[in-house]
């Protein structure tokens, strides 16, 4: 009898313990079921909170037509946000946008996509685990990335394949490692890249299709 009671007691402990094991989505995470819109000329400060995409937005794979977790409108700023997995299609920008200290723990379809012409500045933050590209540029723009760390991706920046519009890419004070293809890939003969004060290693061909390149004070390691 004592043996049976002991077995039942241990079974109860195991069952109770298993109920309190954390899932991949932690209690402090904010699960986003509908894209968060950052309105024109406003600032969204996530205060370091971690956001993950609900199934309504997408599964974070390379499947096309997933929705973003954040849509940032012209003149707006998104800052102090952590994007966990799944991140669906990350962040979409529409116009002149500032992205400050945003971290992508596991890039989904893309970390960020430029959807409308403008000046996009990414200052601080990091991104990793991108099976294809980290940043996707779909419209003519000036695209600046500074004080950023990127690791383990296909490409750091990709201009829309087959497009000929003009893009100016500016990379400053970044650390870029383990890109399978390149830092920047474009099919446009007019697009430019300017990279300064940046450390990089194992980045594939470095530049693919880029015909206008300026580099200064960079370190390969």
UniProtKB/Swiss-Prot annotation:
Keywords assigned by UniProt, alphabetized: Calcium, Lyase, Metal-binding, Secreted, Signal
Cofactor: record remark: Binds 1 Ca(2+) ion per subunit.
Enzyme class: lyase
Reactions catalysed, as given in the entry: Eliminative cleavage of (1->4)-alpha-D-galacturonan to give oligosaccharides with 4-deoxy-alpha-D-galact-4-enuronosyl groups at their non-reducing ends; Eliminative cleavage of (1->4)-alpha-D-galacturonan methyl ester to give oligosaccharides with 4-deoxy-6-O-methyl-alpha-D-galact-4-enuronosyl groups at their non-reducing ends
Pathway the protein takes part in: Glycan metabolism; pectin degradation; 2-dehydro-3-deoxy-D-gluconate from pectin: step 2/5
Pfam families: Pectate_lyase
Top-level taxon: Bacteria
Endpoints of the signal sequence: 1-27
GO biological process terms held by the UniProt record: pectin catabolic process
Family: Belongs to the polysaccharide lyase 3 family.
Additional free-text comment from the UniProt record: Hg(2+) could replace calcium ion.
Entry function: Catalyzes the depolymerization of both polygalacturonate and pectins of methyl esterification degree from 22 to 89%, with an endo mode of action. In contrast to the majority of pectate lyases, displays high activity on highly methylated pectins. Is also able to cleave trigalacturonate to galacturonic acid and unsaturated digalacturonate.
Protein name according to UniProt: Pectate lyase C
Species of the source: Bacillus subtilis (strain 168)
Gene that encodes it: pelC
């Amino acid at each position: 009898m004592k043996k049976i009671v002991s077995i039942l007691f241990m079974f109860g402990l195991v069952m109770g313990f298993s109920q309190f094991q954390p899932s991949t989505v932690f209690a402090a995470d904010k699960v986003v079921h509908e894209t968060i819109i950052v309105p024109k000329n406003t600032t969204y400060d996530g205060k370091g909170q971690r956001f993950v995409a609900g199934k309504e937005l997408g599964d974070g794979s390379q499947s096309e037509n997933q929705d973003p977790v954040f849509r940032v409108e012209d003149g707006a700023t998104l800052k102090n946000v952590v994007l966990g997995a799944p991140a669906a299609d990350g962040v979409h920008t529409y116009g002149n946008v500032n992205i400050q200290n945003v971290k992508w723990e596991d890039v989904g379809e893309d970390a960020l996509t430029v959807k409308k012409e403008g000046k996009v500045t990414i200052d601080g933050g990091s991104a990793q685990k991108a099976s294809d590209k980290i940043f996707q540029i779909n419209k003519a723009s000036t695209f600046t990335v500074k004080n950023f760390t990127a690791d383990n991706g296909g490409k750091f920046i990709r201009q829309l394949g087959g497009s000929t519009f003009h893009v100016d890419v500016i990379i400053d004070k970044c650390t870029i490692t383990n890109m399978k293809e390149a830092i920047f890939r474009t099919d446009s003969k007019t697009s430019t890249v300017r990279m300064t004060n940046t450390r990089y290693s194992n980045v594939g061909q470095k530049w693919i299709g880029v015909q206008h390149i300026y580099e200064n004070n960079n370190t390969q390691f």
